[in-house]
Amino acid sequence: MQVGEHREILKKGDSIYYNSMAPHGMIAVGGKDCLFYAIVLNPTGEPVPELSRGDILKTLPRERDPQQRVYSKFIERKEDSHGTPLSITFKNTEHFNFAFDIVDEIAKKSPDKLAMLHIGRDKTERRFSFEDMRKNSNRAANYFKSLGIKRGDRVMLILGRSYEFWYAMLGLHKLGAVAIPAMNQLLAHDLEYRFNAADVCAIICTAQGDVTEQVDIAQNSCPQLKTKLIVDGAREGWRDFDEECKLFSTHFDRNENSPGGEDLMLMFFTSGTTGFPKIAAHNYKYALGHFHTAKYWHNVDPDGLHLTISDTGWAKALWGKFYGQWMCEAATFVYDFERFSAADILPMFAKYKITTFCAPPTMLRMMVKEDISKYDLSSVKHMTTAGEALNPEIYRLFEKATGLQILEGFGQSESTMMIGNLTGAPHKLGSMGRPVPIYKIDLLDSDGKSAPTGEPGEIVVDTRNGAPCGLFTGYYGDEEKTKEAWHDGYYHTGDMAWRDEDGFYYYIGRADDVIKSSGYRIGPFEIESVIMELPYVLECGVSAAPDEVRGQVVKASIVLTKGTKPSDELKKEIQQYVKKHTAPYKYPRIVVFCDDLPKTASGKIQRNRL
């Protein structure tokens, strides 16, 4: 079979599955559908070569003495001869606290070992050792305590890629306050909901942009928000985090009542389609669930430098810049750019000798457009991607330019990585990979039965024998949503996929219509709610539309009130209104006017038909 330049040998009985809603199913050139045709490439029936294992283990040395690693007190693992994990088990988790048990212990063992290389917007270089992180996090914990922040209090962090994020997080972990990372593009409308839903009492916020102004507006409706700390700037009514924190002691002792294990540690707001964002709650064991992400997917080198491109408001930042990487004693590279520019970041690979790299497909596409062949990427030994489906042509262009094969993975804000192409194991182009050892994964059809090979089903986690480290504990403050997602012994992800005869999973899309655009997960309901505020809008349905660069973009289908005439000016007015009343990345890039919207028998909008 051949589609464009892509060729695939089909066996007797194989079928071709095309889903126009799935990024992997996009077949178009210049915005027009292509003719789909097949060519016989193997008429003689010659044997098809077996999949070969990745050669990454030939270029990165095996770990010399893993028993000397700090994580060995909490993690046991078995590998095959290629270094692929056969099993990963956790121990001594009852009081596990990442800040104390990993970061502080590495600092004791190797105080000068590099933890993070941070590049500021002005290109200022800052190097933080694990001892720096230990001391600064102790200062932060003491500072937070002096402000009256205590165990169980909710603290939001909107810090972009500021280096203060890392030791503020560690300080909160030590104190027992619950950390809530968030994006700096949120507006007052978004913040007000989040402050009240999570009962946020304190916020640490960057001075960059206008987010502090938005916080001040939202605070008028959120009396529980008492403490506001600003980083890298000053504002009336805000305390200076940088100046005040450094005045506190670098000693913060752990005691028998220190938080850990099953205690609540972290919350993420995650988008849905039938309401405002849900709050995925994680305990202290969550950090352990990221070990395999760094060790066997990112394949980090304890003597190397890992780059994951992600804002700290995304769960992906904790996947790729924090827990797993530091458990493996690898340093992370952070560049605090204002707006992503491939031409800006590509020269840094050679300059700083970045060894492992992870980025969402959107940014990989931008790099390809910049012509990666012009840059020296020879230091990079391993590449990964997640967040949305990776276009095959991007995969091939990177392989041609670097000799590296980009390995995909899958997970959620509610979890760590569930499915992935792991080091040393076979992998297939276009596949998310196979389930990782700590998760028992299945696909269930609409009848709740395991989906046959080649058939679509919802990705579920089997928790009948207990939930794995890394899976969330439920949606905070929403027992109904928790039961909807977690019932009959399974956690239902809401994501659809199919699997082949070798057990490889292929992503289809969200069952609940969440839009994935440039790595963001955008819930239609939030956008619909804003658009419906306009007096001339009768009905509105928001859905995803395919986009070559972003994967998907927001599309708004609108029914106008009687007497309102559709026009291009009206479309622009609607787009500007959404930009002003919610985070700008959520605005509908496509606006269409309709006479009516498709609905189910019960009156629900059928977004998959928009």
Regions found by a protein language model. Name each.
Residues 112-170, 187-192, 242-246, 285:
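Conserved AMP-binding/adenylate-forming core of the ANL superfamily
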Residues 288-308, 312-355, 370:
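Conserved AMP-binding/adenylation subdomain of ANL enzymes
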Residues 111-114, 229-230, 236, 246-269, ...:
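Conserved pre-ATP/AMP-binding loop-to-beta segment of ANL
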Residues 126-131, 265-289:
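Conserved AMP-binding A3 loop
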Residues 327, 354-358, 368-428, 440, ...:
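Gly/Ser/Thr-rich phosphate-binding loop
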Residues 186-196, 203-208, 357, 468, ...:
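AMP-binding/adenylate-forming catalytic core of the ANL superfamily
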Residues 63, 146, 170, 174-243, ...:
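Structural core segment of the AMP-binding/adenylate-forming
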Residues 438, 449-484, 522:
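Conserved ATP/PPi-binding loop(s) of AMP-dependent carboxylate-activating enzymes
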